[in-house]
Amino acid sequence: LPISVKTCVGAEHCRFGTQHSMDTGILLEKMLFDMYAPHKVKLAVSGCPRNCAESGIKDVGIIGVDSGFEIYVGGNGGIKTEVAQFFCKVTTNEEVMEYSGAFLQLYREEGWYLERTSHYIERVGLGYAKSKILEDEKGRKALFERLIDSLKNAKDPWEVMQTKEPVKQFIPIAVEA
């Protein structure tokens, strides 16, 4: 099932931006583009607390603040909107990748088929997820390592398209007169 990462323009192009949200979003997208999960996974990175990318209602939402990033998990848009719950605060892009990646791997390993992260968090409790990731550094690093290991052979579909010869829409047919 697909993943998507939505970003706002962040500090690069917005006077309110406190963090470079597009850079962080690109890093997340490249890390996770071929990830399989129990259900679709939506991520968002907002460059400031104004939350233009709607990070507060995504499976994993990253919100830039003056001192780094706040990570929210378990949000859901749509008819039954669920506001994501505050998970932790980090300072670097590397920490964003590690903490959000560890959470997604925990969800991949323990989530039920067709269960969104909001229902997963409702079932196991936010405290459980925090204990596995925030309170257990070795466990977090192991979860993140398993995620990266599972994605190491993924091929970027855009890169494959760029290396092949362009496909022609119409191929001439030789006709004998």
What is each model feature region?
Residues 1, 37-42, 109-123, 140-150:
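Flexible, glycine/charged-enriched surface loops at secondary-structure junctions
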Residues 5-8, 44-50, 118-129, 152:
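A glycine-rich phosphate-binding loop feature that marks nucleotide/adenosyl-phosphate handling sites
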Residues 129-137, 174-177:
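Extended hydrophobic packing segments that form well-structured cores
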